[in-house]
Amino acid sequence: MAGLKRAVGIGAGIAALASACAAYAASPAIVAAIHARKANYKEIGGAFKTINDEIKTGSPDLATIRPLARDLLTRASGQLKYFPKGSGPVSGEKTRAKAAIWADQATFVKLHNDMLGAARLLQAATVSGDVAAMTSARTALGGACKSCHDKFRESD
């Protein structure tokens, strides 16, 4: 009889735990937003790396970096939609987004706007072909990204 009570107790405990875990499971929309966010950042990072590498040559291939700068700006412009409430650590999904994003939206949006301004400068500089302007805009964009990452992204 004691064995049966113990088995029932363990079963009830497992059921309660499973129920609690299910209550904290992220919705499909949140999971999709997190995956889209990661994919978007991967594309932004890849574009930035290629642009940066080209600028470092001193004679960047404009045919390569112009579309990348335009794509980077487009992707950055739509970035906030990938941060719906519940898509941070509370989701239970693997994400480097800190809860501070939702706790301090004003700062997050300000830093996002700083990044957009720098991305616009970079895109305009690639259109003009002015390497000095590209270098300056690239540095500003890297700094804007770093400012946000330092405050709102978990380290590797």
Predicted regions: what they are:
Residues 6-7, 38, 150:
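Hydrophobic alpha-helical segments, especially transmembrane helices
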Residues 13, 20-22:
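N-terminal signal peptide c-region/cleavage motif recognized by signal peptidases
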Residues 141-153:
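The canonical Cys-X-X-Cys-His
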Residues 19, 139-142:
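Processing junctions and N-termini across compartments
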Residues 156:
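Short Cys/His-rich "knuckle" micro-motifs
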Residues 11-12, 43:
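A periodicity- and composition-biased signal for non-globular, repetitive helical segments
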Residues 26-140:
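Extracytoplasmic c-type cytochrome modules immediately beyond a signal peptide or single-pass transmembrane anchor
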Residues 1-11:
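Bacterial N-terminal signal peptides that target proteins for export
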